[in-house]
Each structure stands twice: as C-alpha cells, then as structure tokens.
C-alpha cells in the first residue's frame, strides 16, 4: 500500500512516523523545500513524553508529482489550509485513491453524510464556494479524528505530550 501524508506539521509528522513501522510505503509531502531537506537529513525527530528524542527516517518530498498516485492520501493541515492542498492531492490521486482528512473543526464533507435537511448542502463557513466538495468525491473519503496532543518545538523536534 502506498500512503502519502500531506502536511509536515506536528500531526502529519506523528502520523507519518507511526505509519513508517508498517509494511506500507509512506511518503511525507511538505510545502517548503527547506523543511523537506531538514527531514531528509535528520528524519522526523520526536520527543517522547519521557523526554527521549527519536529519529524516524522517512521519504519526504516537496514535489508530490515525484511520488505519483497513492492508495491513501492523509490530509494533515489546518482546515483553513485545505484548499491549498488540492494541487498536491490531485498529483497524488489515482482512480482508486482514498482521502482521509485529519483536520480541526467541522469537516467540509459532514453534510454529505447526513440526512435531510443537511444532505447535499455546502457549509460556506468550512467550504467557501464549495471548492472542496467539488474537488474531492465524498464517496472516496474516510472521516478521521485525532485526540493526540503534539506540538512543534523551536528546534524542529515534535513533542508528543
């Protein structure tokens, strides 16, 4: 299975690092070339609750076209940044790609899974202009929630609380 994690923040790095211990081929897609270079050189660095620093080597890129279509694309960005991931998601999507957004707030796809009166409605507050609803087929979505507490520290280490 080929899995791309889009977003190199605390949640994206945690999910990518955890998935790297599975047989799946994991790729972390980040926005900035300098972030890709840092992770490529140092791995994903995480501080455990006990303070131990771990380094997880991972395939990282700032060019989603370089890794091609994936079986699963996990979106790990803030809800307001989702629209900016659509070009990366397009590059990673094949006919059977499943999308799993791990975002904060009310997900844009929520009304699609509800009965009337919400069914088929677009919530403008979370999907202005219906851009996300039009770009991502709701039948290819897996809803996700995370209850993990992680933060980016100034030194590039992800602290898992």
Regions found by a protein language model. Give the residues of each.
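Rossmann-like NAD(P)(H) cofactor-binding subdomain of soluble oxidoreductases
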Residues: 53, 57-154
